[in-house]
């Protein structure tokens, strides 16, 4: 009997706590509803105007990006074009590629998708065989390499597929996450939770991306043999 009494008492405590929590939620909702009821027509009109202004600004920004070539993944024809393209856009992802390198085609597929999704960023692809000066200046040694630029300056590099899980089968979401780590796109996910299906599969911990200085180092590209 004593055991049953303890259970009944425990159940009663839980029930009271649940009722108290429900009451708090109810009071909060009542308070929010009351606030809405107290908003006058002038205030509602002001909120509406602010919302419309924000929408107009966003649309204008979108049109500006599109006019500068954002929203599509494009090849640039010359080294001079590169400097002009980078100068006019705040965020740029630049894929240094070679036609004969298989992994470049893998990146092409993912970058074409991300270019349409992230209008805030310009996505370009110069052919390394047509841009020797540019490759020398940026010290591009591995093909493929993504140069990530902000305000005309190189902020980071993605060299080969090491940061993408060391696999050719990485997802578009994985590349998107990696670009987000360098703040070259507006990433809405959690940077501390990379979208790998299995981190152990790659034998590397990517939960915290370490900053690497790539400029000035020499690399060999096994992908050039493809």
Curated annotation (Swiss-Prot):
User: Phosphoprotein among the record's keywords?
Assistant: yes
Family annotation (CDD domains): Phd_like_TxnDC9
Q: Which UniProt keywords apply?
A: Cytoplasm, Cytoskeleton, Nucleus, Phosphoprotein
**Thioredoxin domain ranges (all copies):** 75-180
Among the record's GO biological process terms, what is one?
Answer: microtubule cytoskeleton organization
InterPro entries assigned to the protein according to its UniProt record, in alphabetical order: Thioredoxin-like_sf, Thioredoxin_domain
Spell out the Pfam families in the cross-references: Thioredoxin
Q: What is its main location?
A: cytoplasm
**Cellular component GO terms held in the UniProt record:** centrosome; cytoplasm; midbody; nucleus
Q: Where in the cell is it found?
A: Cytoplasm; Nucleus; Cytoplasm, Cytoskeleton, Microtubule organizing center, Centrosome; Midbody
Sites bearing Phosphoserine, chain numbering: 188, 221, 223
> Its quaternary structure?
Forms ternary complexes with the chaperonin TCP1 complex, spanning the cylindrical chaperonin cavity and contacting at least 2 subunits.
The job of this chain, per UniProt, is described as: Significantly diminishes the chaperonin TCP1 complex ATPase activity, thus negatively impacts protein folding, including that of actin or tubulin.
Q: Which PANTHER family match?
A: THIOREDOXIN DOMAIN-CONTAINING PROTEIN 9
Q: What is this protein called?
A: Thioredoxin domain-containing protein 9
Species for this entry: Rattus norvegicus
């Amino acid at each position: 009997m004593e055991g049953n009494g303890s259970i009944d008492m425990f159940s009663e405590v839980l029930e009271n706590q649940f009722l108290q929590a429900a009451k708090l939620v109810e009071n909060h909702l009542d308070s929010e509803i009351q606030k809405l009821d107290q908003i006058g027509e002038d205030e509602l009109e002001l909120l509406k105007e602010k919302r419309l202004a924000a929408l107009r600004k966003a649309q204008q920004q979108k049109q500006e990006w599109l006019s500068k070539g954002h929203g599509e993944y494009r090849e640039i024809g010359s080294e001079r074009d590169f400097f002009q393209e980078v100068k006019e856009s705040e965020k740029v992802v630049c894929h240094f590629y070679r036609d004969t390198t298989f992994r470049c085609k893998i990146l092409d597929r993912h970058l074409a998708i991300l270019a349409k999704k992230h209008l805030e960023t310009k996505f370009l692809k110069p052919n390394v065989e047509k841009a020797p000066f540019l490759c020398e200046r940026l010290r591009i040694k591995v093909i493929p390499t993504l140069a990530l630029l902000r305000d005309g300056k190189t902020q980071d590099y993605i060299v080969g597929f090491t940061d993408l899980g060391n696999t050719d089968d990485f997802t578009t979401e994985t590349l998107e996450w990696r670009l987000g780590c360098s703040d070259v796109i507006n990433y809405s996910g959690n940077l501390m939770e990379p979208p790998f299906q299995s981190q152990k599969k790659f034998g590397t911990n990517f939960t915290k991306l370490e900053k690497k200085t790539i400029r000035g180092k020499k690399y060999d590209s096994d992908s050039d043999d493809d």
